Design a protein with these regions (language model features):
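Active-site beta->alpha loop and helix N-cap motifs at the rims of alpha/beta catalytic domains
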Residues: 1-2
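Surface-exposed amphipathic alpha-helical tracts and adjacent flexible/coil segments at the periphery
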Residues: 6-347
Length: 347
């Protein structure tokens, strides 16, 4: 609330992290009421309890979610029973929420006053961290390039990636914007499964004894390959999955042939080729360096300044001589050789 934010600012806090449930309107009001920077959640797992204050794990398993030891109680399957004991819904994951993904609302959040974004990453692996952070860096930079008069990066340097970031290709239970725009009709739950489902890859066209034919989705990011994990929701409403042994075009050969209904939609829950790429070095961050080589009365000077504002000048006492041919290109070529450093010559 505005009052809580003002109290925290008065107490000396230099940054405030907003609750996941905070709407855009409330974010805007808080930003107008305080001077400290605001940070907001933008991606990752959601807790079914209000603002993550959950005591179910502690009560049932002796593991406090408020101390980082959540037993994932809300990801279990439950029955929904009425007052007379009749089962209305059986064996569904009634408390399991989708994962947050606010990619489409980044600019709205920035305009509302958010100055940094928080990605939930409890128990996530290195591949997840690489892909998701690179994805949001890319999306934020697009906004900054389009509106340089309004926003600038808080950090320096440029990261060169060896892969194309895509948040849909990392672990997720399906996505939701949560309550950013208030309580809407858009689903926030994932009743079928608490596990990763992944993006749609296509529909089953034909089934054989050891293989099936896939009609690929128009949004298929990469071909199906051996090692991929595919899944589908069965007639009982439960998620079923299998690994791909090999793929020959649109003909898919599973390790173990599942009972696939014709026309069923398949998702890729494990992207083998993408994870293999992310397991290797995937980024190099460099700082731009401006270099000036000039004459001074006692010899020569070399001035270097990076984009953070750090500046160094070196002086060399040498006698001035007139070269028979211009040395300008040779000097530029030599000074541009920065080797294995974190710098790249800008000018």
């Amino acid at each position: 609330t505005v009052e809580k934010a003002q109290w925290l600012e008065a107490a000396g806090f230099r940054q405030i992290v907003l609750a996941r449930e905070t709407t855009l309107d409330d974010t805007r009001r808080i930003a107008q009421a305080v001077k400290v920077p605001l940070e907001a959640f933008v991606h990752g797992a959601l807790c079914v309890s209000y603002s993550g204050r959950c005591y179910a794990s502690q009560y049932c398993f002796g593991r406090s979610a408020n101390r980082g030891c959540c037993a994932q109680f809300c990801r279990l399957a439950f029955d929904l029973v009425d007052a007379d004991g009749r089962i209305i819904v059986a064996d569904r994951h009634l408390l399991s929420l989708r994962d947050m993904n606010r990619t489409s609302s980044l600019e709205e959040m920035m305009d509302a006053g958010v100055r940094s974004f928080k990605i939930e990453g409890r128990l996530k692996d290195v591949s997840y961290v690489k892909n998701v952070t690179a994805w949001y860096r890319q999306e934020i930079d697009k906004i900054i390039r389009r509106r340089p008069e309004t926003y600038r990066r808080a950090s320096f340097g440029t990261s060169q990636l060896t892969f194309t970031p895509d948040a849909t290709r990392s672990y997720n239970r399906g996505f939701t914007n949560y309550f950013l725009h208030g309580r809407t009709a858009a689903p926030v739950h994932s009743f079928a499964t608490p596990k990763a489902v992944g993006p749609v890859v296509g529909q089953v066209q034909r089934v054989r004894r050891q293989s099936f034919t896939l009609i690929p989705s128009d949004h298929l990011s990469a071909p199906i390959v051996g090692g991929d994990g595919l899944c589908f929701v069965g007639a009982d409403g439960k998620l079923q999955g299998f690994r791909v042994n090999k793929a020959e075009g649109h003909e898919i050969f599973p390790n173990r042939m599942p009972r696939l209904p014709l026309g069923v939609t398949l998702h890729r829950s494990l992207d083998f080729a993408f994870d293999k790429t992310l397991a290797k070095p995937t980024a190099k961050r460099t700082l731009a360096l401006d270099i000036a080589f000039r004459e001074v009365p006692s010899g020569y000077a070399l001035d270097m300044a990076d984009e953070t504002g750090c500046h160094v000048s070196l002086f060399f006492e040498y006698e001035h001589t007139v070269a028979q041919t211009s040395q300008r290109e040779a000097v530029i070529r030599q000074l541009s050789k920065l080797g294995d450093t974190c710098f790249v010559a800008r000018q």
